[in-house]
Amino acid sequence: MAQRQFFGLTYNFYGQPAPLFDLNDLQELAGCYARPWTSRFSHLAISTGSLPVWSARYPSVASRNIIVNTLLGAHLNPFAGGQVTSHQGITWRDPVLSSLAPVPAIQPPPVWAVAENVPLDSNNYPTYVLNLSSMWPINQDVHIMTMWALSDQGPIYHLEVPVDPMPAATTAALMAYIGVPIAHLAQTAYRFAGQLPQSPDSTMVSTIRWLSAIWFGSLTGRLNRSRTCNGFYFEFAKPALNPDQAVLKWNDGARAAPPAAAQSSYMRCISPHWQHQIVEVAGALMSQSVTAVTGLPALIDEATLPAWSQGVANLTGNGQGVVPCLDYNPVPMAAARHLQWRQDGLITAAQEAQLNNDYTAYALTIERHLTAMLVANPIAAGRMPIQPFNAADFGQAGQTAAAVALAQAMFV
């Protein structure tokens, strides 16, 4: 049975007095006469090659998601124990929050004095559970917004690998996706999770959960064509050609053994590179499409999270039973991936060095692009297409080594 409640958190204002979007965003992303739900995926077409591409008002791969999150957070007061309200002359068209519309001329709803970091609980709005089928997409987008809002770095996502082997039905389902890029797989997962109330133990949920783990195992290099998960792995393009691409592959060769114990962890990219990497944004969205259906398996350890994410009911905490959130940087992660490829005999030492040089150059291009776009889009102007960062953030190693070790424990 589908879960009948959810919990969430609205987006941070990053020191500004109001949500960071404008009326043009309402028209371009959600539309005052269209549903704002399940509208996250056009951003994945921004970067299709090895170089970042300027796209006017949405200058990074993550920009549209960031704006959608800030926009939704400004209109979710019913889930914070309040009424259906308006903000900037816009309100919900009906009680099931199907679409946004201009405030009606007669008896307009009260204006909400919007706030950042507002805890949300579907139990506060009884209309949700009474109209679960029609309002289900709200659960998905609130969940994704929350997993981004809890972090001041990259979005948080969950990974797990059980001790039991992959079910036969899941293996059969995965076969249909061989040759499909990560962006398309994430889009499939997002559309599946948001269409109707889903059962947490369905074959499709299992398929997406395994896809997320296989993607992460391949990101670290642990999974490759010489060591697969039941035959599956993601193949990454050469950095000099298109480093922002990963395609599901299958190989009838050596396979990783199940872990000695079930593995579970929350993850996030700690350096700003994630904002302009399809593999990072798509990988996170794919995993979040699972936990939108199943709910979080445990509280997220708040140890490395920002102050506004401390002790958020049903989401974060500390002490016994919490699951850690490992931070990683894609540059040393790529180096670990290339090292594993060499150790597995897939490339030579000279090729490893060249791959590392190419990836470092690619990462520097992203750094320069995002830095320029942050200057060109100051949040003091009232809009946040680029999430704020400091120059030193690009060099943070975080817990990359621990993340790699986790993949090794997942796929023995």
Swiss-Prot record:
- The answer, when asked if Cytoplasm is one of the entry's keywords, is no
Question: Where in the cell is the protein located?
Answer: Virion
* Pfam families cross-referenced by the UniProt entry: Sigma_1_2
Q: Does the keyword Glycoprotein apply?
A: no
Q: Chief localization class?
A: virion
Per the record, its GO cellular-component terms are: viral intermediate capsid
Keywords of this protein's UniProt record, alphabetized? Answer: Capsid protein, Intermediate capsid protein, Virion
Q: Which InterPro entries match?
A: Sigma_1_2_reovir
The job of this chain, per UniProt, is described as: Located at the interface of the incomplete T=13 outer capsid and the pseudo T=2 inner capsid, 120 VP6 subunits clamp and stabilizes the inner capsid shell.
Q: Which family does it belong to?
A: Belongs to the reoviridae clamp protein family.
Q: What is the annotated quaternary arrangement, including any partners?
A: Interacts with capsid proteins VP3, VP5 and VP7.
Q: What is this protein called?
A: Clamp protein VP6
> Lineage of the native species?
Viruses, Riboviria, Orthornavirae, Duplornaviricota, Resentoviricetes
Q: Tell me what gene encodes this.
A: S8
